[in-house]
Amino acid sequence: MVHVSSFKNDHPLDKRREVAERIRSKYLDRIPVIVEKAPRSDAPDIDKKKYLVPADITVGKFVYEIRKHMTKVSAEKAIYLFVNNTIPPTAALISQIYERYKDEDGFLYITYSGENTFGSDL
């Protein structure tokens, strides 16, 4: 079953496209990204969904930035990003991921999930 973005449900295509085009024309070196938690994920929530990401940062650096916006994330919790149901390479540039996976509205949609990496609490 494919997860449909709540951002897409809340905003019509033409409005999303207009916003993305305005962002891309005003900030040439930035990528408009929507980040949402995967369904049934126990990862912490984030305080915002829309990000204006520098085109030249890596996926790994973006994970670090996402962690800073999470509420109560423990060091043991690994955060995974998914683009089009695939985990992108950590060293890939956001601009590369955008060019390959951007949506028809001009946004890059990223889903995140988490997992405890050092075992569970007993």
Swiss-Prot record:
It holds the Pfam family ATG8. The keyword Coiled coil does not apply. GO terms for cellular component: autophagosome; autophagosome membrane; cytoplasm; cytoplasmic vesicle; pathogen-containing vacuole. GO terms for molecular function: phosphatidylethanolamine binding. It is found in: Cytoplasmic vesicle, Autophagosome membrane. GO terms for biological process: autophagosome assembly; autophagosome maturation; autophagosome organization; cellular response to nitrogen starvation; defense response to Gram-positive bacterium; DNA damage response; macroautophagy; mitophagy. Gene3D superfamilies: Phosphatidylinositol 3-kinase Catalytic Subunit, Chain A, domain 1 (3.10.20.90). Induction: By Legionella pneumophila infection. It comes from the Eukaryota. Transmembrane segments: none annotated. The C-terminal 3 residues of atg8 are removed by atg4 to expose Gly-119 at the C-terminus. This Gly-119 forms then a thioester bond with the 'Cys-563' of atg7 (E1-like activating enzyme) before being transferred to the 'Cys-288' of atg3 (the specific E2 conjugating enzyme), in order to be finally amidated with phosphatidylethanolamine. This lipid modification anchors atg8 to membranes and can be reversed by atg4, releasing soluble atg8. InterPro entries: Atg8-like, Ubiquitin-like_domsf. Belongs to the ATG8 family. Ubiquitin-like modifier involved in autophagosome formation. Participates in membrane fusion events that take place in the secretory pathway. This is Autophagy-related protein 8.
